[in-house]
């Protein structure tokens, strides 16, 4: 039976345990994800408390991380999503995404509405990918793809 969390507390505590195990075992998220059949972004988000994992994936990652049966069950529960505490993020990496939305949010909204009409881009029917590519001017660049289904507003 599908279970749902009503507060972020249990998943936040599990996230701390997961990150500790990942560090102790010197694993990457990619290594933990291997064989789950899920995208790296989805599994990473689940391990950080933002998604539920299917039973087989929960068992696999728990085995890799040395987690108990309680953690396997908790990884399968529907979390309280978007539960980052504190409002405006203070972590520099997360803050840059917040800043990008602050600068380009109205542009994205205007262009989505111009191309699609009144509606939203789903974060439920959604895929995320990040690639590291060389910068022709030196260094590296991050190519981040946000691929969400367009959902039109339906008058009622």
UniProtKB/Swiss-Prot annotation:
<comment type="function">
    <text>Catalyzes the reaction of cyanate with bicarbonate to produce ammonia and carbon dioxide.</text>
</comment>
<protein>
    <recommendedName>
        <fullName>Cyanate hydratase</fullName>
        <ecNumber>4.2.1.104</ecNumber>
    </recommendedName>
</protein>
<feature type="active site">
    <location>
        <position position="99"/>
    </location>
</feature>
<feature type="active site">
    <location>
        <position position="96"/>
    </location>
</feature>
<dbReference type="GO" id="GO:0009439">
    <property type="term" value="P:cyanate metabolic process"/>
</dbReference>
<dbReference type="Pfam" id="PF21291">
    <property type="entry name" value="CYNS_N"/>
</dbReference>
<dbReference type="InterPro" id="IPR003712">
    <property type="entry name" value="Cyanate_lyase_C"/>
</dbReference>
<dbReference type="GO" id="GO:0008824">
    <property type="term" value="F:cyanate hydratase activity"/>
</dbReference>
<dbReference type="GO" id="GO:0003677">
    <property type="term" value="F:DNA binding"/>
</dbReference>
<comment type="similarity">
    <text>Belongs to the cyanase family.</text>
</comment>
<dbReference type="Pfam" id="PF02560">
    <property type="entry name" value="Cyanate_lyase"/>
</dbReference>
<dbReference type="InterPro" id="IPR048564">
    <property type="entry name" value="CYNS_N"/>
</dbReference>
<dbReference type="InterPro" id="IPR036581">
    <property type="entry name" value="Cyanate_lyase_C_sf"/>
</dbReference>
<dbReference type="InterPro" id="IPR008076">
    <property type="entry name" value="Cyanase"/>
</dbReference>
<feature type="active site">
    <location>
        <position position="122"/>
    </location>
</feature>
<keyword id="KW-0456">Lyase</keyword>
<dbReference type="InterPro" id="IPR010982">
    <property type="entry name" value="Lambda_DNA-bd_dom_sf"/>
</dbReference>
């Amino acid at each position: 039976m599908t279970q749902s969390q009503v507060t972020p507390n249990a998943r936040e505590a599990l996230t701390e345990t997961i990150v500790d195990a990942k560090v102790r075992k010197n694993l990457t998220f990619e290594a933990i994800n291997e064989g789950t059949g899920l995208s790296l972004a989805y599994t990473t988000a689940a391990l950080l408390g933002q998604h539920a994992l299917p039973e087989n994936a929960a068992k696999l990652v728990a085995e890799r991380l040395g987690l108990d049966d309680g953690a396997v069950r908790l990884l399968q529960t529907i979390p309280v999503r978007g539960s980052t505490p504190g409002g405006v993020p203070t972590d520099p990496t997360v803050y840059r995404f917040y800043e990008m939305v602050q600068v380009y949010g109205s542009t994205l909204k205007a262009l989505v509405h111009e191309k699609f009409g009144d509606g939203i881009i789903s974060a439920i029917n959604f895929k995320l990918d990040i690639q590291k590519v060389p910068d022709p001017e030196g260094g590296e660049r991050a190519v981040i793809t946000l691929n969400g289904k367009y959902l039109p507003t339906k008058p009622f």
